[in-house]
Design a protein with these regions (language model features):
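Rossmann-like AdoMet
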Residues: 24-136, 142-186
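Rossmann-like AdoMet/SAM-dependent catalytic core
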Residues: 38, 256-333
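Conserved acidic residues
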Residues: 189-194
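A conserved beta-strand element that flanks and buttresses the S-adenosyl-L-methionine
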Residues: 213
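A short, conserved alpha-helix within the catalytic core of class I
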Residues: 221-232
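Conserved beta-strand signature within the Rossmann-like core of class I S-adenosyl-L-methionine
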Residues: 237-248
């Protein structure tokens, strides 16, 4: 019964990942494609813009612009310029960098740039230690790691809705990119599919060291659902495995929270994606302990500031409420 309950919660998480990041619309020969949601496109835009224009690069996602495409890039630039009011977008207008840079650097760029830098650095350390390993990207969307990856020993599994995978593969085809041999798209229909079985059917090997990334998701989940998600991953992974994620702390929606934290919450709610309250470090620590994980690295906002934003001249600073976690799965007693 508990296993079934955890599985359902994991389904809710990934169904959420899909619904948060994507929506259906009519276009093209098949009349249905899947596009990223606005907040996910904001993150893609931040990586693309930073890689194209940033002088002090926090993270160089040099393929983000190509995969996103000029049309969507311009659309999101306009959205930021127009204070996140989508009704004012125009296909005949290009956004002004001068008009978006302050809002982009203050509200949008800090979290996605620093968390992907943290996650991929930890992944590379994991791969260096273990050699052959598996990287599971939960709700991969327009993630580009598999196409930037130069290590053939890292096998990438991208979990997403079937329509999402088709849309991404179509973009890759349009760009004439080759799909690497060590990339596997894992389609998940959560009304019918079991995540564990889908991964196993796709070639996931439980006895191979595995690294799971769940980025940008905890903001929108209650602690019980997120906790049960950790439990499901723990049941799938071997002892030589790690999980990485980011989370907002308990100050997120409190009266004492920073101004821009509240502003970002207002922006995401305006875009139809309401943030939940944050978690305390104690809650996170106890949750991981319950499912045989031990925290290897906890990056506080102050540590993130020193690691990624110190001495910058562009005004990008770490968010006051965001933490990064890397956890090891240990052998059960």
């Amino acid at each position: 019964m508990l296993r079934h309950h955890i599985q359902l919660s994991f389904h809710r998480l990934f169904a959420f990942c899909v619904s948060r990041r994507y929506f259906m619309f009519k276009r093209g020969l098949n009349m249905t494609e899947t596009r990223e949601s606005t907040t996910a496109k904001l993150c893609s835009f931040a990586r693309a813009y930073h890689s194209n224009t940033g002088r002090q690069k926090i993270f160089d996602d040099y393929l983000a612009y190509d995969l996103m495409g000029k049309e969507e890039y311009e659309e999101i630039g306009q959205l930021i310029e127009n204070d996140f009011e989508s009704e004012q977008l125009s296909i005949n207008y290009s956004f002004s960098s001068k008009r978006i840079i302050e809002k982009l650097n203050r509200y949008i760029a800090p979290i996605p740039l620093s968390r992907i830098a943290f996650a991929e650095n930890k992944l590379l350390e994991f791969a260096q230690k273990h050699g052959k390993c598996q990287y599971v990207v939960c709700g991969a969307g327009m993630d580009t790691f598999a196409f930037r990856n130069g290590n053939p020993d890292i096998h990438v599994f991208e979990l997403d809705h079937p329509n999402t995978g088709r849309y991404k593969r179509e973009r890759v085809k349009q760009l004439e990119w080759n799909i690497p041999d060590n990339l596997t798209f894992v389609p998940i229909d959560f009304s019918t599919d079991n995540m564990t079985q889908a991964l196993l059917d796709a070639g996931f090997q439980p006895d191979v060291p595995s690294f799971f990334a769940i980025l940008g998701v905890s903001y929108y989940l209650t602690l019980p659902v997120f906790a049960q998600t950790i439990g499901e991953i723990s049941g799938l992974c071997t002892a030589d495995s790690q999980i990485v994620f980011d989370y907002p702390d308990e100050t997120t929606l409190s009266g004492s929270g920073a101004e821009r934290v509240h502003t970002l919450a207002e922006i995401t709610e305006k875009l139809g994606e309401k943030m939940m309250h944050g978690y305390s470090f104690r809650e996170i620590s106890e949750t991981l302990e319950r499912y045989s994980y031990e925290i290897e690295d906890h990056e506080t906002p102050q540590m993130i500031e020193r690691q990624y934003f110190e001495n910058r001249t562009d005004g990008i600073t770490a968010f006051e409420n965001i933490h990064f976690i890397l956890a090891d799965r240990r052998e059960s007693a």
